[in-house]
Amino acid sequence: MRKDVAIVGAGFYGLMLGIFLADRYNVTIFEEENDVMTKASSLCQMRIHTGMMYPTNLQTALSCIKTFKPFMVRFKSAIVDNFTSLYAIASDSKVSCEEFLTVQKSLGQKFKRIDNTIFSNRVTDVFKCEEFTFDPVIIKSILLKECSEKNVKIEFNHKVNNVFELSNFDKIFLCNYAEINSLLRNSGLTPIENVSSFVTEKIFYRDNLDNVAVCVIDGNYFSTMCLPERFNGLKTVTGADITNNISIDSNGKYISGYQRLFARMREFIPDIELEYDHSEFGLKSVNKNSNCRTCMVRKESFDLNIYSIMGGKITNVFSMFDQLKNLEKF
């Protein structure tokens, strides 16, 4: 007889987990919104990480490298590659150009040094690398189709306030990302340590660098990403010290940091022309003691079949499967 499994959160990780488990279990996903992939899954920059962005965190870089190919194969129809990706080493970077080169070569990364034609003297070296983005609409369509084919049930507009509301299920998986610790506390369970949750901003804009994405490393600079054609030329830009520190006005509305980030971008690229479009805001959770962005799977106790899954980069969903298999026979 097939056992029943509950998953809290119909984001990318929750949907992938539901499809993974559906071969052996009856799966029900509980989602408090009226659609899937509306929160953290939609706030990511859509960059398919190869590890280039993490020269100071080999654990994250290696995890990205390991899961890159499985993601590319799994979602081949959603991959976008019609742009150039530039990595620029800032003059006051946490890593020198030599250190960056040593790390990337040891990881087997594909890149080449190019002439600095657009950056100011705040950049010492520029590298062109092979990087990709993805179309979230296509990925969403793929996952919903597979959920339907595997009879994964999704309960929309259903907020789970206490995990023991789901005590009639044989196993419970928490995939609600930034809200996991709140749910654990409400359930009388121990929250995940060293996790910081905060409101983050995703800025959508246009510039005159056609089909060029830029990442300035390593420090509090900025990272841009080209988007699929359906976004009509829009790009996204983030800068952790700005987009992860959001203020609220007297009316309770989030205040965008785009003007400060645009000023920074002009310091590095003097001739850039910038046009703000809009921003999206949402909760984000990270390891507050390091910039490690790997996936973590934790069983809440030996006598409870409750599992917390804290997603990392989007490709790291494949390491979630490995960790689950190591915990039990799923």
What is the meaning of each model-derived region?
Residues 3-28:
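N-terminal Rossmann-like FAD-binding beta1-loop-alpha1 element of flavoenzymes
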Residues 23-42:
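Glycine-rich FAD pyrophosphate-binding loop
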Residues 37, 171-214, 254-255, 271-272:
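Central helical "cap/lid" subdomain
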Residues 45-123:
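Dinucleotide-binding Rossmann-like beta1-alpha1 core, especially the glycine-rich loop
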Residues 79-89, 113-147, 303-311:
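Helix-loop-beta segment of a Rossmann-like dinucleotide-binding subdomain
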Residues 127-164, 171, 175-182, 317-325:
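Helical element adjacent to the flavin cofactor pocket in flavoenzyme catalytic cores
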Residues 211-296:
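Active-site lid/adjacent beta-loop-alpha segment flanking the redox-cofactor pocket in flavoenzymes
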Residues 269-330:
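C-terminal catalytic lobe of FAD-dependent flavoproteins
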